[in-house]
């Protein structure tokens, strides 16, 4: 049997701890055998739109993502072909001209708020994970991230959360929990769940003759 990578989808609300879960799994396997594809990098290119129009982008809606490109890249990685991962510029609200070269690995983690929303993506996944975290914790984490990393103001983050993030979470993100094989409360802090995930991944790798 030839080698075939394992694809793991890690979904959950903004600030739920998806990245922490992905990082915890990554740390168990190391750089040699695992890579992470962040759905945040796959927002649609909006360079054809005026900046004022880009400011209206709803980043929490399924239509904001270029899932066609993400799916194309996963298929390439499944064939052990390298990809050029896009980079998104949040200050300009469009895709950057830069790309990141990603070499194929045995484990592919696809991480993002809506990676379980698209059936085409789900069909590529061997293991589907939903990270479930209290809404109060999620908004605090989003505040810290958007102010520190994306140059946002406190008021703008709160306004966006109430008018966009929360309703989009309830409408699109939360319902994808039903597709998950594993639901992890407390995100990356849940050591027991992470250890169980790692054991499951190793089993799937062995079944696919990767290890």
From Swiss-Prot:
It holds the Pfam family PRK. Pathway: Pyrimidine metabolism; CTP biosynthesis via salvage pathway; CTP from cytidine: step 1/3; Pyrimidine metabolism; UMP biosynthesis via salvage pathway; UMP from uridine: step 1/1. CDD domains: UMPK (cd02023). It comes from the Bacteria. GO terms for cellular component: cytoplasm. It is found in: Cytoplasm. This is Uridine kinase. It comes from Geobacillus kaustophilus (strain HTA426). The gene is udk.
């Amino acid at each position: 049997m030839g080698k075939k990578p394992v694809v793991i989808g890690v979904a959950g609300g903004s600030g739920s701890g998806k990245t922490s879960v992905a990082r915890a799994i990554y740390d168990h396997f190391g750089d040699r055998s695992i890579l992470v594809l962040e759905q945040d990098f796959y927002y649609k290119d909006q360079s054809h739109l005026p900046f004022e129009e880009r400011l209206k982008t709803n980043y929490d809606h399924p239509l904001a993502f270029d899932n066609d490109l993400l799916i194309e890249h996963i298929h390439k990685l499944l064939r052990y072909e390298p990809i050029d991962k896009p980079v998104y510029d949040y200050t300009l609200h469009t895709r950057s001209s830069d790309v990141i070269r990603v070499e194929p690995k045995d484990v592919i983690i696809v991480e993002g708020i809506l990676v379980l929303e698209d059936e085409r993506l789900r069909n590529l996944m061997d293991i589907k994970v939903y990270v479930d975290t209290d809404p109060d914790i999620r908004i605090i984490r989003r505040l810290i991230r958007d102010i520190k990393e994306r140059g946002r103001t406190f008021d703008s983050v709160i306004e966006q959360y109430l008018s966009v993030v929360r309703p989009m979470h309830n409408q699109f993100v939360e319902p994808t929990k039903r597709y998950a094989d594993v639901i992890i409360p407390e995100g990356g802090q849940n050591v027991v769940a992470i250890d169980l995930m790692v054991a499951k991944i190793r089993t799937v790798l062995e079944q696919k003759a990767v290890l």
